[in-house]
Amino acid sequence: MWRCGGRQGLGVLRRLSGGHAHHRAWRWNSNRACERALQYKLGDKIHGFTVNQVTSVPELFLTAVKLIHDDTGARYLHLAREDTNNLFSVQFRTTPMDSTGVPHILEHTVLCGSQKYPCRDPFFRMLNRSLSTFMNAFTASDYTLYPFSTQNPKDFQNLLSVYLDATFFPCLRELDFWQEGWRLEHENPRDPQTALVFKGVVFNEMKGAFTDNERIFSQHLQNRLLPDHTYSVVSGGDPLCILELTWEQLKQFHATHYHPSNARFFTYGNFPLEQHLKQIHEEALSKFQKIEPSTAVPAQTPWDKPREFQITCGPDSFATDPSKQTTVSVSFLLPDITDTFEAFTLSLLSSLLTSGPNSPFYKALIESGLGTDFSPDVGYNGYTREAYFSVGLQGIAEKDIETVRSLVDRTIDEVVEKGFEDDRIEALLHKIEIQMKHQSTSFGLMLTSYIASCWNHDGDPVELLKLGNQLAKFRQCLQENPKFLQEKVKQYFKNNQHKLTLSMRPDDKYHEKQAQVEATKLKQKVEALSPGDRQQIYEKGLELRTQQSKPQDASCLPALKVSDIEPTIPVTELDVVLTAGDIPVQYCAQPTNGMVYFRAFSSLNTLPEELRPYVPLFCSVLTKLGCGLLDYREQAQQIELKTGGMSASPHVLPDDSHMDTYEQGVLFSSLCLDRNLPDMMHLWSEIFNNPCFEEEEHFKVLVKMTAQELTNAIPDSGHLYASIRAGRTLTPAGDLQETFSGMDRVRLMKRIAEMTDIKPILRKLPRIKKHLLNGDNMRCSVNATPQQMSQTEKAVEDFLRSIGRSKKERRPVRPHTVEKPVPSSSGGDAHVPHGSQIIRKLVTEPTFKPWQMKTHFLMPFPVNYVGECIRTVPYMDPDHASLKILARLMTAKFLHTEIREKGGAYGGGAKLSHNGIFSLYSYRDPNTIETLQSFGKAVDWAKSGKFTQQDIDEAKLSVFSTVDAPIAPSNKGMDYFLYGLSDGMKQAHREQLFAVSHDKLLAVSNRYLGTGKSTHSLAILGPENPKIAKDPSWTIR
C-alpha cells in the first residue's frame, strides 16, 4: 500500500476507534510488562543484541528498551506495555531516485513468496491462517514499513517468521513482478489476436491513486518543495514511469535496501522481548554481516528566494461552481524532524494557526468565501527529513490566486504582531492531555507510524514519545518568553525564503491527455517488439495465467487451528437504569484512565419524510453554529477547553431478526476528562435546548466544506459508495442508508452548496431539532471508571432533566413501528432491573418487496469501483454465520485470484454485513463487465462446493480475527447499546460460526446466491462504458 504522507501534527495522539468485539480484558491498571522491561540494564547481551537504553515513559504507560544487533548494526526498539494486542514491524529506509515505483512494487513482490515459504502469495494466505488484528505493508516517501499485530503468542511467532522470510529472503520471481508491477499482455491472454495492453496491480493502483486531485496536489507539493533528492520523485510510482522499471532493477533495489544494517525493528505489547530477539536473530540477522548502507537523505539546499509552480488536474464533476476549481497553497520548509522539541513546537504552532474557527487562517481564508476548504496537506507535515508547513484554499477562481497569497502573508504579519490568546493555547494543551489518556486498540500501530519518520533519519524515537517532557519544556518557554510562538512564526514563515506557491487548475482534457500519453507509450513499446518478443509475451501471459489458476499448496506456511480460538466470549458487565423518569441509561465501568465517554441515541421516527435527507447536514453543523449565549467561535473554544470532541451522526441500525425492520436515529457522542464532566453535560444541555440556527454566513462556509470533503472522499471510498447504492433496493433500510451515506447525499450537498439563497435549507434545521433534540425516544450510555460512576450518574441525570420533552406524544411518520425490548442474557452481560430495560422502537415494512436496480455513476476516473449486493438473512438466523464464512472463503479462494491477480484490480472480495446484505466488490479496477462476470463465476464456484475442510477452517480463523478484534474501554457495551446484541446472542452466533460445515456452506450458496434478479442489485462508479451505455437495464447517472 502506498501512502503519500505520514506523521502530521501529533499523529500519535489521533484516536482510532476499536473493533466490534473484544476477546481479552484490558489491564491498564497493571504494569507487569513495564516492570519486567525495567529489569534490563545497559550493556545486557540478549540473543545477539546489546541493550543500550532503558527508559520509563509514564505518560504513555510504557517502558522503552533500545537495542542494537552486534553483527549487523540493526536497530531495535521494544515498547513494553500491558496491552495484549502485540505488534511487530520492520522498517527499511528506501530512497528511490526515479518515479518507477520500485520501492512500492518491491513491497508488493516480497510478499509473493520467500525461501522458507515458496508458495504463491503467503501474505494473503496468512490472513486466513492467523488471528491477526492487523496485517499490511506501507510504502512512504523514504521508508517501507511491514507491521502486523495479534493477541495470540503462537500466532505472533508464526507471523514473525513469515514477515522475516518475506523481507530478507524473498523469491522475487519474474512472474510475480509481472503480476504486481506491470506487464505487456494480450487483452485475452489466451488469444494472441487480441490487442496488447498494459496490466499490473501497482500500475492500476497508482492510476487510481492519481484520480484523486488532492493526491496529485500533495505529490507535486512535496516534489517541488524538496527537489534535491528522493522527495523529488513519486515513491509509489508514476503510472507512466512504472512502465520503465525492469525486473533486474527491482532485484538490485532489494539487494541494496533490504539489509539488516538498513533496518529498524519495532515490537510493542506485553509479550516477552527475549523470544522476539531470539527468533529475529536466528531466522534472519545471524545470516548477515554489517554493511554501510548508502541510503541517507541529505539536507535540502535552502532557496535564496521563493518559487512558484502551476500544475493541472482533472475536472471535478461535483464542483459546486465549475468556474471555481483551482487550488493554491503557500508552503514553507521547516527544520529537520530529528530536532524533536522543535518539531513538537511547530506541530502545536500549526494547530494554533489552522485548527478550528478561532484560528487565524480559518478566519482569513475559510471565512473569506473565496474557496470551499483548506488546500490539501494543510498544516504541519513531518514525514520528510525536513518538515514543512502548508496553507491555502481549494475551490477558488483562478483569478483569486494572488488574493489568497496576499491573505496568507497578511495573516502571518498579524500573528507576528498579536500572537495567540491564552485560552487557545490552553485548549490545545488540554487536547494533548485528553489524547494521551484516551486508549486506542491500535496503539502499537499508531506508535510505529508516529516514530517511523524521525527514526528513519536517525532521530531518537524515545525522545519523541516523552510527551510529558515536551509539554513541560513548551510551557517553560512560553513562561520565560511570552513572544516565543510569535518569534517562531517570524523565523519560519515571515523571514523564510524557502517558500513555494503551488497552484493547480482543472483541465477538461486532463484524463484524455493522460490516456493519450499512455496510448503513445503502448504504441512505441508494441512497435519495438520483434516477432520473437511477441511470442514470448504470449507465452509468458499463458504461463502467468496458468500459475494464477493452479491450486497452490500452502502447507509450508504456519497456521493456527480452529481449536486455538477461544470458545466463549468474556462477559461485559453493564447496568441499565431509568433516569429522569423513563430514559434508560447504560453504565459500563471500565479502566478509562480518568476519561468519561457519553453517548445518546435519539429516534427519528416522528421526523417528516421531507426532512429526512437533511439529517446528515443537521448532524454535521449542530455543534458548530453556537448554542445558548455562545456564538460559534465561543462554542468551539469551550468544546476544545472542556471536551475531547462533541459530534452527532445519523445511524440506520438493522434488526437482528428481521430483514425488513430497522431503527433510525442520531447518535450524539462526546468524551472528556472526569473533572470536566459537568461542563461537557452543560454544553450538551445548551445544544439540545438552545442551538443557534441564525448564523447564515457561517452555515454557508460549513456547507461548502462538507460538500468538498464528500467529493474528495470518493476516490478512496468508491467501492463503499457502489455497495451502498447496490443495496438500496434490497431492504427498507437500504434506501435510508443511501440517503444518509451514499451518492444521493453527495449529490444533495452539491446542490445545496450551489444555492445562492441558502435560507430555505437553514429554516429546516429548527424543524429537525423539534423532533430530535428532546428526551422522547432517547437512550444514553456512559463508560467511565467505577470511581467516577456516582459523579457521572448525577451529571447525566441533570442533563436529562434539563432537556425538553413533548407535551403530547408524537406519532411515528411510518405507519408500522414495533417496540422491541432489548433482552438481557443469562450470562450476566447486563444487569437489567425489572421494567427498566432498553426498548427500541423499530420501523417495519411488512409488504416490502426487493427489486433489482443497476446504476452506473459516470466519474472522470481511469479505474472503476464495482459493487453487487444480494439480500440474505439477518444476524440471528443460523444461515448468517454460514454466509459470513462463505464470504471469506470466496474472497480468499476465488475472488482474490480472479479480480486482483488476473484482473489487475487493486482489491476486491466478498463480505456479509450485519444487516444481512452480501456484497461482492472491486476497488481501483480496470474492468467492469469482466468483474461482474467474475462475481457470477464466484457464485458458481461456491455452489459447486469445490473447497476443502482446510479451506473452511482457514476462513473461520479469518472471520474470528475480526469477531475477536480488541475493543477499547471507551467502546465496551456499544453492541448492546446500539444494536441490542447481548453477550448471550453474540455467544450463540459464535457457536453458529464454529458449527459451519461444508454442507451448510453448500446449502446457503444455493439458497441465497444467484436465486433471482429481485434479490440482486449492481452499481459501478467509473468512466463511460459503451457496453453498459447500450444496455437499457442500466441507469446512467
Swiss-Prot record:
Its EC number is 3.4.24.-. It is an enzyme of class 3 (hydrolase). Pfam families: M16C_assoc, Peptidase_M16, Peptidase_M16_C, PreP_C. Keywords: Acetylation, Disulfide bond, Hydrolase, Metal-binding, Metalloprotease, Mitochondrion, Protease, Transit peptide, Zinc. The modification N6-acetyllysine is found at K759, K770, K884. This is Presequence protease, mitochondrial. PANTHER family: PRESEQUENCE PROTEASE, PRESEQUENCE PROTEASE, MITOCHONDRIAL. Its main location: mitochondrion. The keyword Ribosomal protein does not apply. Belongs to the peptidase M16 family. PreP subfamily. The modification N6-succinyllysine is found at K770, K849, K946. One of its GO terms (biological process) is protein processing. Binds 1 zinc ion per subunit. It is found in: Mitochondrion matrix.
